[in-house]
A protein has these predicted regions:
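N-terminal strand-loop-strand beta-hairpin
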Residues: 25, 30-48, 52, 118
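A cross-kingdom feature marking solvent-exposed beta-strand/loop segments within repeated
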Residues: 4-6, 28-38, 59-77, 92, ...
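Amphipathic alpha-helical segments
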Residues: 16-29, 96
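Vicinal oxygen chelate
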Residues: 44-47, 54, 81, 90-132
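N-terminal beta-strand motif that seeds the catalytic metal site of vicinal oxygen chelate
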Residues: 1-19, 74-83, 132
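Short, structured motif recognition centered on aromatic/hydrophobic residues
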Residues: 5, 12, 22, 46, ...
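Short, charged/polar surface micro-motifs in flexible loops or helix N-caps
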Residues: 50-53, 60-62, 86
Length: 132
């Protein structure tokens, strides 16, 4: 079901500062950058081997990332796991009685459809299912 780690997402107040940090400290380059209007965030993806560091910065005060930053401050927001079939993985988790944030896969970045699983059932970790 899980095939790889797609990304580790970090919520940041200063996207440009975070990009500069990862570039200067580790030589990481931005491979993809996108504003995801429906989530109220701007992302920058920096490749690390076969995965990404996803830097998330809110563009609206009502976004979940803005609320996260207000409540918890900057830091690890979620882990994205690659799956063969996002809809099937989501249905399996729900059939086992675990909570999901999304009822069905929804648009994500890079033209994908994704689904989030509730951190209360995942030992405090927000999980994103990302198709291969």
């Amino acid at each position: 079901m899980l095939t790889e780690i797609d990304h580790v997402a970090i919520a940041v107040n200063d996207l440009e500062g975070a990009i500069t940090y990862y570039h200067d400290a580790f030589g990481a380059e931005v491979e993809h950058r996108e504003v995801i209007e429906h989530d109220g965030v701007e992302e920058a993806l920096l490749r690390v081997a076969d995965s990404y560091v996803q830097l998330l910065h809110p563009i609206r005060d009502d976004s979940t990332v803005a609320k996260y930053l207000a409540n918890k401050g900057e830091g690890l927001h979620h882990i994205g796991y690659r799956v063969d079939d996002c809809a099937a993985a989501l249905e399996r988790v729900k059939a086992l009685g675990f909570r999901a944030i999304d009822d069905a896969p929804r648009p994500g970045s890079r033209g994908t459809t994704v689904a989030f699983l509730h951190p209360k059932d995942a030992f405090g970790t927000l999980i994103e299912l990302v198709p291969e």
